[in-house]
């Protein structure tokens, strides 16, 4: 009887302790929320007052769009490099990025790591770049009066693009001759050739090169694969080198060509659960046995890493090349007042083995490249057949070839 009373007494004490702990936790959370809200309102008030004084008594007249726009971009610069603000005049540029259409010279550019310069990698046939005589390997020295030395591809690209019909002076150095050349180029509307080439080698190995994951690219990849298969293809090389990504849905459709229906290829996870998504294969594949090699390099990013990493995790392809870029962050466009937009990072991508492809120690390094941590500090994951793969930034190839 006494034992039963003691047991009941202990239950009441434990219940009371749990209630006190729950209450204490709620008080702490409420206080943290209050502190956070106070910090937000305090800093907004300080910012408003600073600008008000600048506007009233600063020695020169300020351009509100320029000054406040710089403040917004400075705030976003402290976050990841993919959260970006687009005022009304720049929204069109964001839409062009999503559709694969833009105004520029029509050439692929890339960072030459040995030279530390941005070079022309491929002028598109019939483009302003091709008509001006630009060649693969040409080193970009300046655009108009802006020197491009030690600049990254994003910086150079932003200066090559502009309004249709505008002209600029491009200065390059041609390594094959050592000569410095200048040419005047007129920008015009460009539609990216996301699938510039596919073909069949004499040894019956097929080759498909995909430049970007723009809307509809999966249909062209599907058509190319079926055509090569009808021509006797016995193995496929799928080249994603230099592919900076694009539509995740298109990436899932391409992987779905080679893996069964109802497989979760990508999960997105972030702070708000209602914004989390699972991307599954939805149709039956067209081939599950064809040997496939996926080629990647340091400029293979985002949707390209979902494709190569998904094929690796499901043991459907061998990944060959160098470690990929490591962009595993999810962005969504958010409408802002006065027709502006915010491209906002809301979560991270996780591929079939449950690893995240985002570089863990991302930082704004010189040139915009990530700093990868050693494998000894990363976590192990398993592919479908039990092979060890790791997180820690991008996809590490099964076979490393530089």
Language model features with spans:
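A generic structural motif
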Residues: 110, 171-175, 335, 350, ...
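Functional cores that coordinate and move charged inorganic groups
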Residues: 304-308, 336-339, 344-345, 350-369
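Hydrophobic beta-strand signal
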Residues: 141-142, 318, 343, 358, ...
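PDZ/PDZ-like peptide-tail recognition elements
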Residues: 82-122
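Bacterial Sec-dependent N-terminal signal peptides
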Residues: 1-37
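Conserved functional hotspot residues or short segments at active or partner-binding sites
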Residues: 356-402
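Interdomain regulatory linker/hinge segments that flank or connect interaction modules
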Residues: 47-98, 176
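Cleft-lining beta-strand/loop regions that shape enzyme active-site pockets
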Residues: 2, 30-43, 47-64, 119-123, ...
């Amino acid at each position: 009887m006494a034992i039963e009373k003691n047991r009941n007494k202990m239950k009441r004490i434990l219940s009371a302790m749990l209630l006190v702990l729950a209450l204490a936790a709620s008080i702490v959370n409420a206080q943290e929320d209050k502190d956070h809200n106070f910090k937000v309102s305090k800093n907004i008030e300080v910012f408003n007052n600073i600008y008000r004084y600048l506007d009233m008594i600063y020695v020169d007249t300020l351009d509100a769009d320029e000054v406040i726009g710089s403040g917004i971009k400075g705030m976003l610069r402290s976050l990841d490099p993919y959260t970006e603000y687009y005022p009304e005049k720049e929204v069109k540029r964001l839409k062009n990025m999503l559709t694969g259409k833009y105004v520029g010279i029509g050439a692929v550019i890339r960072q030459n790591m040995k030279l530390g310069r941005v070079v022309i990698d491929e002028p598109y046939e019939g483009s302003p770049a091709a008509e001006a005589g630009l060649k693969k390997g040409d080193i970009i020295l300046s655009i108009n009066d802006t020197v491009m030395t030690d600049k990254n591809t994003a910086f150079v690209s932003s200066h090559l693009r502009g309004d249709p019909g505008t002209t600029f002076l491009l200065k390059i150095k041609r390594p094959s001759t050592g000569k410095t050349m200048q040419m005047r180029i007129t920008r015009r509307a460009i539609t990216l050739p996301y699938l510039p080439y596919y073909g069949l080698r004499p040894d019956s190995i097929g080759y498909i090169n995909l430049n970007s994951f723009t809307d509809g690219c999966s249909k062209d990849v599907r058509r190319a694969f079926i055509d090569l298969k009808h021509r006797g293809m016995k193995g496929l090389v799928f080249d994603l080198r230099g592919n900076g990504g694009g539509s995740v849905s298109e990436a899932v459709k391409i992987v779905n060509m080679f893996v069964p229906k109802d497989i979760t290829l990508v999960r997105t996870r972030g702070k708000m659960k209602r914004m989390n998504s699972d991307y599954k294969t939805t149709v039956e594949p067209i081939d599950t046995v064809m040997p496939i090699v996926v080629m990647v390099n340091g400029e293979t990013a985002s949707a390209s890493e979902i494709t190569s990493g998904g094929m690796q995790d499901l043991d459907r392809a061998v990944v060959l090349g160098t470690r990929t870029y490591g962009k595993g962050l999810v962005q969504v466009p958010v409408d802002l007042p006065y027709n502006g937009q915010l491209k906002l990072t809301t979560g991270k991508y996780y591929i079939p083995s449950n690893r995240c492809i985002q570089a863990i120690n991302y930082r704004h390094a010189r040139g915009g490249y990530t700093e990868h941590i050693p494998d000894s500090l990363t976590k192990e994951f398993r592919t479908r057949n039990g092979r060890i793969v790791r997180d820690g930034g991008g996809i590490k190839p099964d076979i490393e070839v530089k």
